């Protein structure tokens, strides 16, 4: 008798997610903006309404990814701070402590795959809008989508690199302190 295959962590199966509701909303916002852009005019005959709904879905996707999905699915968060005195702007990155939080391989895979695929799809739609030259307003909507999706992609990529670098630095720094303390104590005992 054949045994049914068991789903393993890391597969693209939302049921394996540690946070399935967060994951479904994340994927829902990501795909709904694309679907509204592609098929909205077929079902809603009002161009302005399709434009506004797509813009609202893009904004909801940006907010949800930045503030909720990134933190819950991969333990990363970012924001931009502006020094009011100088007007200088800098990005702040935050990551969960790997010792206290385990990230699901399925959540991680869905998150990063969707994070990189969505801007690629919008780039394809931008090329299509340029080639068609049917309406500049559609190109402006795609440009807004590209700004929002690429901003999140760049920010989370930097946040992940920052998180990995600080984890390695903490391990190296923490290991050296323990080695120095242990070496110093043992050296004093056997003097």
UniProtKB/Swiss-Prot annotation:
Entry annotated with the keyword RNA-binding: no
Key words of the record: Golgi apparatus, Membrane, Transmembrane, Transmembrane helix
Membrane topology according to the record: Multi-pass membrane protein
GO cellular component: Golgi membrane
Classification via InterPro entries: TVP23-like
Chain ranges passing through the membrane: 16-36, 38-58, 110-130, 136-156
GO biological process: protein secretion; vesicle-mediated transport
Pfam families assigned: DUF846 (PF05832)
Localisation per UniProt entry: Golgi apparatus membrane
UniProt xrefs under PANTHER family: GOLGI APPARATUS MEMBRANE PROTEIN TVP23 (PTHR13019:SF7)
Function, as annotated: Golgi membrane protein involved in vesicular trafficking.
Family statement: Belongs to the TVP23 family.
Protein name: Golgi apparatus membrane protein tvp23
Organism of this sequence: Aspergillus fumigatus (strain ATCC MYA-4609 / CBS 101355 / FGSC A1100 / Af293) (Neosartorya fumigata)
Phylogenetic lineage: Eukaryota, Fungi, Dikarya, Ascomycota, Pezizomycotina
Gene: tvp23
